[in-house]
Amino acid sequence: VALVSGQSASALIVDRLGLGPHGRQPVTLQRVLAALIGVSAVVVAVSGRLDSAEIPIWLVALCFVAGIGVSVQQAINGRVRDVSGEPLVAAWLNFVVGASILILVFGVMVLVGTVAPRALPSGPLWLYFGGVVGVIFIATTSWVVGKVGVLRLSLLAISGQLVGSLVLDLVVNGYLDAPLILGVILAFMAVIVNTIQPKKPDALTGLE
């Protein structure tokens, strides 16, 4: 929830500043409402799965900051795609930088004895399919963000994640969770609210 909150709030600002290839978009009541509905969708979806364990405030804050970074990353990926003309370039850059940092951190942890290296594969082979999914996701979003903007992309991603959770629950666990179903409905409502074209601008920032 903290991550989605940070992502939605940041998406409004990123679009307002025009960091993404879709250009500058005003902060309107309609867009703010769409972002709030999107966050509410996640809150409702996970409401039946939260336990009573207290989560440290620093961890919540870290997730919020990570959400902010997601929106900025999506905007930058879109710019990279525009400059290069190839969505896979953005995906390649992300994974080169990410892999380099992970290798560096892992090397330090091995040297100080925090972790011990293990032979690969160290888990089920299907886990490694996540890397392929990541490449497809980043390549796709780097292209889509230029068409719809960062906020709408974020709302679409939230909707897709909740639908994916719904399908996995049905296929793997054999049941449907009522809060998750309601969360999916709210997520698509957020997309619809953000997509509807207002008759006149209601900008809160003075940007037409």
Model-derived features: where do they sit?
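Structural signature of hydrophobic alpha-helical transmembrane segments
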Residues: 1-9, 54-69, 118-134, 179-186
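Helix-helix packing/entry segments at the starts of transmembrane helices
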Residues: 1-9, 88-97, 135-169
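C-terminal transmembrane-helix exit sites in multi-pass transporters
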Residues: 8-30, 162-180
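C-terminal ends of transmembrane helices
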Residues: 10-25, 72-84, 136-148, 192-200
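Hydrophobic alpha-helical transmembrane segments of multi-pass integral membrane proteins
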Residues: 34-37, 61-62, 81-130, 160
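Membrane-interface helix termini and inter-helical loops of multi-pass transporters
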Residues: 43-57, 109-123, 166-178
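Hydrophobic alpha-helical transmembrane segments of multi-pass membrane transport proteins
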Residues: 65-73, 111-151, 192-193
